[in-house]
């Protein structure tokens, strides 16, 4: 076994890399190594959730979010994204936040649309969260689900959400960036600017234990420590995207050309049966 929080040397390297890439000020004590992004999400939700809490996400979304949220006894509230570009409609977000809202889940690049949220959109979302925190006198957390962070095309930039909002928890996985989905390795990063972040980190540690994860795979923790900052060949995904997008749109299908990930979210030519 490794430490439940993850190998100390790996966590030091993670902190150093994230600080270098995103101008943060994290240490090893902000990182908790996990069994992939699904574990990162379930642990984070378990650490934050209390009875009657609500978490907001944005359609289209990874369907397991509902399972992960409801596992904690909380409710998932789904807000539709703007149909024309799948960016977030902040008016709808503001209307959806209530006194029961514990946090929101943002996934960028998005599964299944491949859309990357723009910096302008993120700033607007964070402004709404700040406003609602003051209105309700409570913390509202931003859970950043980022397994596709490196899978972007044409020099698209993915804003690092921790730099835009203090109460942020980042959930990351190496499944996509290193093409290692079956090896189950990732991490949680708790912002050092979050209110009572050490208590949040302690809750993350407790949630990981309560959910029975024990520790991330020890061998792959050693491997990841030597691969930080590397990716598999992203150009293959970009080539496939271009071929499929061109073919589908030539046949008359409508879809937004994805900025990242490896999905095309295609609108059917037929009307919805519902």
Q: Where do the PLM segments sit?
A:
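PLP-dependent class I/II
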Residues: 2-5, 9-12, 16-274
